[in-house]
From Swiss-Prot:
The gene is gag. Keywords: Host cell membrane, Host membrane, Host-virus interaction, Lipoprotein, Membrane, Myristate, RNA-binding, Viral budding, Viral budding via the host ESCRT complexes, Viral matrix protein, Viral release from host cell, Virion. The record marks Y129, P130 as: Cleavage. GO terms for molecular function: RNA binding; structural constituent of virion. Late-budding domains (L domains) are short sequence motifs essential for viral particle budding. They recruit proteins of the host ESCRT machinery (Endosomal Sorting Complex Required for Transport) or ESCRT-associated proteins. Matrix protein p15 contains one L domain: a PTAP/PSAP motif, which potentially interacts with the UEV domain of TSG101. The junction between the matrix protein p15 and RNA-binding phosphoprotein p12 contains one L domain: a LYPX(n)L motif which interacts with PDCD6IP. InterPro entries: G_retro_matrix, G_retro_matrix_sf, Retroviral_Gag-Pol_poly, Retrovr_matrix. The keyword Membrane applies. It comes from the Viruses. GO terms for cellular component: host cell plasma membrane; membrane; virion component. A motif (PTAP/PSAP motif) lies at residues 109-112. It comes from Friend spleen focus-forming virus (isolate 502). This is Gag polyprotein. GO terms for biological process: viral budding via host ESCRT complex.
Length: 187
């Protein structure tokens, strides 16, 4: 009568539909083969203590996540869906994971708590000052003023366009307009 050892990886594979549902809730898609590869071969090489059989330890998962999300060539964007799914399973464990997750401890204070009493220091003061903005004079905006010009006035204002032929001439030309000249001919 052989008994098998249950590991985080084997447990997730036994409940694969739940894993995929969790991934879907994270708006990602995971494949079983890559799930096994990342868990058993990739993440153990990151040097953060990830075991080949997986873990539900959030500290280790977050360290792997940090490596996966590293910018540039050190990151692993193809592994993002997988590590965020592991994290989601460990953070809000389904019933089949709960026996394998250590209870969350309330964070202990890292600095000593000072006794409360009358303070000898003056209250802190802010060095912030209100921003001074220039006053805006009411009047027509340049856009609205431009709308009042006639077509011929606008044409004259465009000095950079004076050497171009008018649109009416371009419509009667035998060659295509300037932008279409650079496109390959249609078959």
């Amino acid at each position: 009568m052989g008994q098998t050892v249950t590991t985080p990886l084997s447990l997730t594979l036994e409940h694969w539909e739940d894993v995929q549902r969790t991934a879907s809730n994270q708006s990602v898609d995971v494949k079983k083969r890559r799930w096994v590869t990342f868990c058993s071969a990739e993440w153990p090489t990151f040097g953060v203590g990830w075991p080949q059989d997986g873990t539900f330890n959030l500290d280790i998962i977050l360290q792997v996540k940090s490596k996966v999300f590293s910018p540039g060539p050190h990151g692993h964007p193809d592994q993002v869906p997988y590590i965020v799914t592991w994290e989601a399973i460990a953070y809000e464990p389904p019933p089949w994971v709960k026996p394998f997750v250590s209870p969350k401890l309330s964070p202990s204070p890292t600095a000593p708590i000072l006794p409360s009493g009358p303070s000898t220091q003056p209250p802190p003061r802010s060095a912030l000052y209100p921003a001074l903005t220039p006053s805006i004079k009411p009047g027509p905006s340049p856009i609205m003023a431009d709308l009042s010009l006639t077509f011929s006035q606008k044409t004259l204002r465009r000095t950079e366009d004076r050497d171009r032929p008018p649109l009416t001439e371009m419509a009667t030309e035998k060659r295509p307009p300037p932008l279409l000249r650079f496109l390959p001919p249609l078959p």
